[in-house]
Amino acid sequence: MGLVLLLALGALVATLLVVGWTIRAITRPPRRTYASALAKGRPGEPSQLMPAADGSPRTFENWTIKYRDVDLPVWDMRGDANDGPAVILSHGWGDSRIGALTRAHFLLPLASRVVMWDMPGHGDAPGSTRMGVDEHEALRTLVERVVASGSPRVVLMGWSLGAGVSVRAASNWNDAAATSIVGVIAEAPYRLAITPARNMLRAFGMPHGWIADWAMGFIGADLGVGWHWKKTEPFDRQKYAAQLRMPLLVLHGERDDISPVADGEAIANAANGTLIRLPEGEHHGLWTTESTAIACYEALRDFVIRVK
């Protein structure tokens, strides 16, 4: 009997250790910073992008917004289209403003401004990720700042985690700045937080069944949204997409193994939006693979022209 109890205790401890390690892996993703961009030979700050249309080097401003007593860093670039909207880019899990630079390259000719920020626990921002629970509040603060500084029309664009944050920020928001949001672009969105968590763990060869469920349950409890992530209000991004009062464009790769294309379709349909399915597209690389980058840019261009 003693041996059985000892083995059971050992199994319990081992399980809790795996769950704890999984929680840490999910809530503290690798930080994508200037050094990581340099190691891959990619731009690490806005000034390293291609020159402006007139041949002048790209310039930008650095500033921060306050969120939960934390300063979140922002890059603010001037675009080439004076009559275009300001576009605010919100990154995915494990990404940062560095990843936004790839998209900024395509957006600068279409926008009057391109604004990029690091969410908590990513890039150069302090803290740990909030997993999309309330980052929309920080994004709303950012929208207010952008509008107050001279941009009356704003497009929100995000990918993966940032796609859901963008949809949530623009939905059912009645403050004055909300009327300045003229469109939302969601790249590789997902409906529920557990979906990319399971798929990311699977891709990394880690336990992704009930271990992931337990880990996300503990994370939800810690973030105040409950074990099932709906203590205060549902997380489901489809629900918030249905509340949008502006056009929605969804870009989704059909080979996406992190955010299912079915989620993107459901979100687009809820908002009566436009879904661009990319047959060769995966979760990553839509803007660095030539075939998908061209399709994404054309959809982006047409959307910005439509809403500006």
Question: Which ranges hold each PLM region?
Answer:
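Catalytic histidine-centered segment of alpha/beta-hydrolase-like enzymes
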Residues: 281-294
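Conserved alpha/beta-hydrolase "acid-adjacent" motif
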Residues: 257-263
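Hydrolase active-site cap/lid region
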Residues: 171, 175-230, 240
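Catalytic nucleophile-loop/oxyanion-hole region of alpha/beta-hydrolase
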Residues: 120-150
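An N-terminal hydrophobic leader/cap segment in hydrolases
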Residues: 2-66
